[in-house]
Amino acid sequence: KIKYEVIAKQIEKTGEAQVSTTDPDSRALLIHGQVVEIAYNTQAAVDDKHKLVVATQTLNRNDRNALYNAVKEVQANLEQTDFTVLADKGYNNAKEIDNTQKAGVTTIVAQQEIVNSNAKGTTPDYLVTKFTYNKENDTYTCPENHTLRSTGTLHTKHRDYSSHKFKKYRTPACKTCPVKHLCTVRVEGREIERGEFAEAMELNTKNYKEQYALYRKRQE
């Protein structure tokens, strides 16, 4: 019991979600599928022109939280701030992408599969990608031309070692909408979430779609 109390205090003190008693620097990492191993995660950034490794890192976290630190190391090693980074979908983390863009780097990170909070009962024509965001008045317009508004309340989600804030958008028009059954099974109607790093993600998505041929070069 004393042993576990000591470990609990260590976790509380460091703020880490886990600790390894055999190798303090390692962590339980999802390797592939549902396979978890106590391990490290090695990162390497390669220059496209000369095919040389320009930065390396050994981490005890997965790819989702690795992009920005890798980019900073590349900037320091090359003494260059403006370049384009190509990364697979394992690096698709809104906060990491936002920080990377703010550092002056163009991001082309592969997209995750579309995850919709109301996926059950949502047909393709009513996926969240079919809703238009209106930056001028901070609203969304649905495929049926109804306006979804937010109360302005910021909610928080936690994942892995990070968290992010987001707002929820709804419209009372859902209650009488004749195609509601195609859009959502929620009794209250459709709900759209917009994260604090949404603009960075939208820019990355635009880059990915417009420069997909360039992204494919990382697979060569």
Enumerate the language-model features and the residues they cover.
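Anion-binding and metal-coordination hotspots
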Residues: K1-E220
